[in-house]
Amino acid sequence: MSFKSWINQKRRKVMTAITKSVGSSYSEPSSHDIKNIEIKKVLIIRPNHRLGNQLLTTPLVQEVEKTFPDCAIDLFAKGGVAFAIFENYNSINKIYQLPRKPFSNLFKYAMCWISIKRKKYDLVINGDKDSSSGRLLTNLAKAPLKVFGDVHEDIQRQYDDYLHISKYPIYNLRRYLSKLNFPENNTTLPVLNLKLSNAELSTGKQILDNLNKNENPTICIYTNATADKCYSEQWWESFYLKLKENFAEQYNIIEMLPIENISKINFKAPHFYSKDVREMGGIIANTSVFIAADNGVMHLASAALTPTVGLFSRDNQSIYGPYGNGSLALHTKVKSQQECIQAIKNILK
């Protein structure tokens, strides 16, 4: 572990210890709390700059849209990727962009926090129960109704998927609203959604067609990841060989490259690269299945509504696994490569 990573780990532990009780003084909501309140202005707080974490917020935004169709939603995010992700969400009114490096942008960082205090909201939702800054910002914001994000015991008893990072905020919101006498909501949870336009889908198809130069459906792989989530070249070489043996006659097999322009299969497959998140999504949306280790691009594929196979070297697929549209998470310390191939076959049936 690098010194920087060690410092960040210690910082998170200290901040979590300091802020874990923030919001504990708020009592359970009751129907009295919503008297004379019409929920029109909502603030969702998710101060994380990573692509995957921002994409994992899209189901919560959809849930708020569906529950309060006429509301305006402000987002408190970190970095600039949220602007691309929520570009086609008409309900988004404003995105507060917290700088990724606060100590290099102290004034902007402070102004973002101060701006939260200046505006009144009807409802504030902390999108990450483990975010210290999220809890502090939720506490700081002006609103009669606040969801801090703690997973209540009754949710844990009722839902076996409550651990998932994009699902529990929705379960929390539904529980909170039921306490306010809103109708009980047991509808299917929203999936990650980039809301690609027809033009973006058409452009993605054109790029894919130019790469493949045939009409066969496409399997796309992404071989990069961070730390111990990243599989070795030997692992990917073996897996790529199995993909070719089982699918090459009927499917194109291509690789999406990361910004580092590296390939764990040594560029043996036709490949493409893009810096544009929405263009990447448009290309992926035209493929039959997307295969990747646990990373932000895996969530991007899921948000493009493409069946996504997430390869997990850690046992945390219940928290981060792709879901919906036939997607699944495979724990590769339990599943063999051949079992992974069979799972892909089942998706493509």
Q: What label would you give each PLM region?
A:
Residues 1-39:
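Positively charged, low-complexity intrinsically disordered leader regions
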Residues 73-79, 253-257:
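Short internal beta-strands
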Residues 231-317:
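Donor-binding and catalytic core of enzymes assembling or modifying cell-surface/extracellular glycoconjugates
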Residues 75-106, 330:
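Conserved nucleotide-sugar phosphate-binding/catalytic loop shared by glycosyltransferases and other
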Residues 2-7, 96-193, 215-222, 315-318:
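Conserved nucleotide-diphosphate donor binding/catalytic pocket of glycan-assembly enzymes
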Residues 54-64, 81, 239:
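Short amphipathic alpha-helix
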Residues 2-4, 148-149, 271, 299-349:
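Nucleotide-sugar donor-binding patch of glycosyltransferase catalytic domains
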Residues 41, 45-47, 191, 195-262, ...:
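Active-site donor-nucleotide binding/catalytic segment of nucleotide-sugar enzymes
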